[in-house]
A protein has these predicted regions:
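Short, conserved catalytic or interaction motifs in soluble domains
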Residues: 23
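Bacterial N-terminal signal peptides that target proteins for export
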Residues: 2-10
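Short, low-hydrophobicity acidic/polar segments
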Residues: 27-188, 193, 228, 235-259, ...
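C-terminal motif of bacterial Sec signal peptides marking the signal peptidase cleavage site
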Residues: 17-20
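C-terminal, surface-exposed recognition/capping segments
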Residues: 298-314
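Acidic/polar low-complexity flexible segments
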Residues: 187-233
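Short proline/glycine-enriched turn/loop segments at secondary-structure junctions
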Residues: 278-282, 300-302
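Outer/extracellular conduits and scaffolds centered on Gram-negative outer-membrane beta-barrels
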Residues: 10-15, 174-176
Length: 314
């Protein structure tokens, strides 16, 4: 009998300890009994590698899509504390999943009784991490991440006034979307590569909700983003590639033909000329661009590059 009583007491103890571990923030900040709920939408238009649908002009997520949300609480005395984050990793946001009707997460967070809450959301859920001591958000850019857009949303709420309503977040394009089209005059292209920043960071957004990107010296150390044969789209008119890049210039552009067996692809003549032209263009976050690059015949002995760049609405 005593053994059973001790076992039950130990079980209660561990449950209470678990509750304490999962609610350390709430213990430090007086909270109400009102859980924090979310309503998330996006200005996203249909782009490669996404599953978002356009329903009567309103962009919606689909079932099982995940975002991450960071939350920061500011007390009436202006003390700022990280309030919502991922269990086991305070530098990542809380994963919030769409079930087709509503957004859900666990463990639940509850509205503080006073102060304000700043919410920051990103998609995909593994795209952004947070500086340990500040609100600095950091995005690490790779050739893989360039194949998918980054969405970012901000919502600032007053705890006492807004806690009975869902937190509404509208997510915005945070990167520059660049579609590069190379017409058939360039032949069969096997690989495209260029230099890119390794990372970007921000603490603020502009009036449209787009991150104000800044770059440390280490962020500007370029890596070579390589896109192989299977990353390129082809049709009778030419070859295209769509990338989502941190704002700035495209430098170091090179392209290679399709290699023969046991050989490397050969650099296509004209790559350096394209690179020089691309460096003249600055690509802005939140904008979509269409680049068309042709080989223009000047005379029988020489060729020049004909490039058009236009900003397209989505």
């Amino acid at each position: 009998m005593k053994r059973n009583i001790y076992s039950k007491l130990w079980m209660i103890f561990f449950v209470l300890m678990g509750a304490a571990c999962t609610n350390q923030v709430e213990d430090a900040i007086p909270v109400s009994g009102q859980p924090i709920e979310f309503s998330v939408q996006s200005d996203w238009k249909e782009i490669p590698n996404t599953r978002l649908n356009d329903v009567n002009g309103t962009m919606t997520f689909t079932r099982n899509d995940e975002i991450q949300i960071f939350g920061f609480h500011t007390s009436p005395s202006n003390v700022v504390q990280k309030f919502m984050y991922r269990e086991g990793d305070q530098n990542r946001g809380q994963i919030v999943t769409y079930d087709g009707t509503s957004w859900n997460y666990s463990p639940k967070r509850f509205w503080p009784k006073e102060g304000t809450l700043d919410f920051y959301a990103s998609y995909p859920q593994n795209s952004i991490h947070n500086d340990a001591d500040h609100r600095m958000m950091i995005y690490e850019q790779t050739a893989i991440s360039m194949k998918q857009d980054l969405l970012w949303g901000v919502s600032i709420k007053k705890c006492a006034d807004d806690r009975k309503k869902n937190v509404e977040i509208t997510m915005k394009h945070a990167l520059a979307k660049v579609n590069i089209f190379l017409d058939k005059s360039w032949g069969d292209i096997g690989t495209v590569m260029f230099w890119a920043y390794t990372a970007g960071r921000f603490t603020e957004t502009d009036t449209d909700g787009i991150p104000k990107w800044i770059f440390n010296d280490s962020d500007k150390t370029p890596f070579n983003a390589v896109f192989g044969y299977n990353d390129l789209l082809r049709d009778d008119s030419g070859t295209s590639l769509t990338v989502f890049i941190l704002p700035g210039n495209i430098t170091g552009f090179q392209m290679f033909d399709v290699p023969h067996p046991n050989e490397d692809g050969k650099k296509i003549v004209g790559s350096d000329d394209i690179s020089k032209e691309l460096q003249k263009k600055t690509f802005k976050a939140g904008q979509a661009y269409k680049l068309t690059i042709r080989r223009a015949q000047k005379n029988t002995n020489s060729r020049s590059i004909a490039m058009s760049v236009r900003c397209v609405s989505e």
